Amino acid sequence: MADRTVFDPPPRQSTSSPSNNNPASIAHRSSFAENLRQSPRAHRHPSFTQAAVQELLNHPPAQKGGDPKFAGRDWRQIHVGELVQESDIHWCELDTDVEHATKALIESGPPNVILIRETPNDLTACDSFDYNDLNAYLLVVLGLASPDEAQTDTYSQLASKAREHAPIPLRDVITLAKKEPLTTLSQSEDLSKAVEIFGSGVHRILVCKPGTTTVVGILSQLKLVKFLWDNGSSFPAIDQLYPTILRDLNIGTQHAIAINGDKLLTDALQLMSNEGLTSIAVVDNAANVVGNISTADTKLLTHTSSLPLLQSSCIHFISVILSERGIGDGKDSFPVFHVNPYSTLAHTVAKLVATRSHRMWVVESASPSPSAPATPSLAHASVVQQPSGSGSVPPSPSFPAVSAAALPGARISGRLTGVITLSDILNLFARTSGLNPLNPNESRARRRRSSSASLRPSMDSSRGDYLDTIRGERGSSVDNRK
């Protein structure tokens, strides 16, 4: 059992958010392997030390104060239009090819979605394209998705076109991932309505001009949680919840789905699609959390030279994610995606905001892991070889035999016992404020039911061969399926 330590509420981040203004033309995105040639890693400290990771675990980043224009206002009466900006909107059309849309998605950044319209003159969204769609498309191209009998020819044609590098319009891709309909709100609606919707399990709201379907902004769960966190001192009803520990709030779920770090990355991609998840925990043989893989990480798989990664282990892919983040940030990075039952809500929200995550894994004290080697330096992690000549995929890529226990997370996290999501937190805020959100678990169940039909049927029968399903009911043992 974790120590009964109540963390003081960590300080808050600034409310200012960077603008995502991007040039109209989408530049060529070099592959991860190409970027490695300019990596300054050899001139940096080789890795984030365990002490530094523990410091991040205990003390998320510092605050710069809330926005004074919201001081003294009832958050429930703030209009949703006050939290969004048109610069967050990025459009593609139904006939835009998926390659262009993928580049736009990667380069646009948060809120990590491209809105789709019928013609370039429309300001009404008919659908969306995000990393869940990209993951579903990737599975089709790899032959790991299995459609209904009536769709077999369509899926086969898509895979064939992809192999031939033929243009594939978004209209042929956006139906691959099962998802809920677009949710819209007028910009004049109060935040109470948005909190109620988000607390019911909806992840994204399109904000429209009053009385129209003209989109003027995108409000995400993360943006709203960050707003309420940064301005918490102005909203006492919510601020008073932050010092409470998770165990006493009784939020989240004691059922979390994870994958062993030694399993193939393709298994993780299938698992996320099959379960309707945007991310999964990666664990070692003792169910200790060692990392996190999300559908957003599929952006590292969009170049031909990255294809060997698909046959690598999840733990190797995590090392690639950390290396890529280090190249972008100029330092090694090991984001902490876990909390414990005695973490405060403030501590949990601060981590969600700092890591831009949708969920935190709930862990208890670490379990001994068989054959756990010393934590390796990330500088020594194997990387994808840069292809020579025409840029073809190396015929025999080699990947290190790195155990799931080798990353820093295996030593400082703990045994996975549950998960807490942005939906859970916003559901708490809604209920505390007298609103009536739906149970977010019902929304999760719907996504999983609708997603399960899109994967190869044989996956269900072999699921136990690679899936670790962690059921953290108090007093029960961990169900480690091997």
Swiss-Prot record:
Biased composition (Basic and acidic residues): 462-482
Keyword annotations from UniProtKB, A to Z: CBS domain, Cytoplasm, Nucleus, Repeat
One Pfam family hit: CBS
Gene: sds23
Protein name, UniProt field: Protein sds23
Region (Disordered): 1-46, 366-398, 433-482
PROSITE patterns per UniProt: CBS
Sequence ranges of Low complexity compositional bias: 13-25, 451-461
A GO MF label: protein serine/threonine phosphatase inhibitor activity
Biological process (GO), any one: regulation of mitotic metaphase/anaphase transition
Compositional bias ranges of the Polar residues kind: 433-442
Subcellular location: Cytoplasm; Nucleus
